[in-house]
Amino acid sequence: METSQITETINMVSEEHLDIRTVTMGISLLDTVAGTPQETAKNIYHKITTYAKNLVAVAQQIEREFGIPITNKRISVTPIALIAGKATPDDMLYYAHALDDAAKAVGVDFIGGYSALVQKGFANGDLALIKSMPRALTETDLVMSSVNIGSSKAGINLDAVKLMGETIKAITDKSDTANAKLVVFANAVEDNPFMAGAFHGVTEADVVINVGVSGPGVVKRALEKVKGEPIQIVAETVKKTAFKITRVGQMVGALAAERLGVEFGIVDLSLAPTPARGDSVAEVLEEIGLEMVGTHGTTAALMLLNDAVKKGGVMASQRVGGLSGAFIPVSEDAGMIDAVEAGILSLAKLEAMTSVCSVGLDMIAVPGDTEATTISAMIADEAAIGVQNNKTTAVRILPTNGTKVGDMVDYGGLLGTAPVMPVVPKSSADFINRGGHIPAPIHSFKN
């Protein structure tokens, strides 16, 4: 390598917040099913602790060798509803606690996969899992949960949309922060390394390593060098920068998989912000030319950013997957928080932005008295964008008891701080209460 390249890499880490956001081990639990929930839970704990016992140590060793921070070490597992069978909501708690205990035993930050896939309908295990969520997410510390309620092939399960609005409200009654551990998807992917939506799909190998990279600060610094240039130069600069960022993820992921003796899965190309200044997707958009994120032109700038990240990253990794785009979580992005507080960034604008990026209405605080049907309607709107446009969309909404619009809610750590945002005061109840199933779009019929 040339001296300039070495210096550039050092600066990306030390000054521009480049990190490996997560090394996530995906583990299949399909072979853990036993005669009783208690036996299955015991098998779940044993398999996770067997395969993941060295995950944290290996990640830390790679950090020391290469000087590249690995912010999170995580686990994803088979959607638990798929192995639940005839379990009751109370039975599901054995599985939730087994996941939590295993995650703590091996020292990871989070474990994802307390999940259900209900885009076409409910099986018993799906309903049992969803009904158990208020207890499961408040009685555990590290368990992350997701529910897929729609897909471009199946349409949208409006009964599930309604149930998830009610479930989110029920969780709020027990905890103001537990909903940060739950995401509702359309077109969920099977190899996502990011939380809270990670689960290990049934088409995956038994155990794999997936990596999520992050570098909004690196992209921002690169764009500072092309101020005033035509927009195609901006796109080209982002592509080249994304290539460099992704090569780091490819190297770390392949090395971690080799040392752990498991398969290497994918690199997720997502630009994932943190609450730290200089590590913000909003600041990247503003560097492209917006006075503040949320103003007119934001959606176009985000489309360019998202597309250029994918184009640059695809060439840098042998396998790209996950969500791969730009994340716009309000509470986890200092620039987004500023824009909401200034009254520039609204829920309506955020919804528009989700049509061109990963992944959806994410980490958004709303007043605690927001109706369950209103939350369901927000989920339905996001699902519609994903289903119609054949992309992943999601909602991670945080109703917070005792808050009003403008209050700040602190979720701690990487989850950050969110200003409470207003929702439209008119009701969507009659629409949501219809229930049933929104058919798949006409372009879903491809055979």
From Swiss-Prot:
It comes from the Bacteria. Transmembrane segments: none annotated. Gene3D superfamilies: 3.20.70.20. This is UPF0210 protein LCK_00974. Belongs to the UPF0210 family. Homodimer.
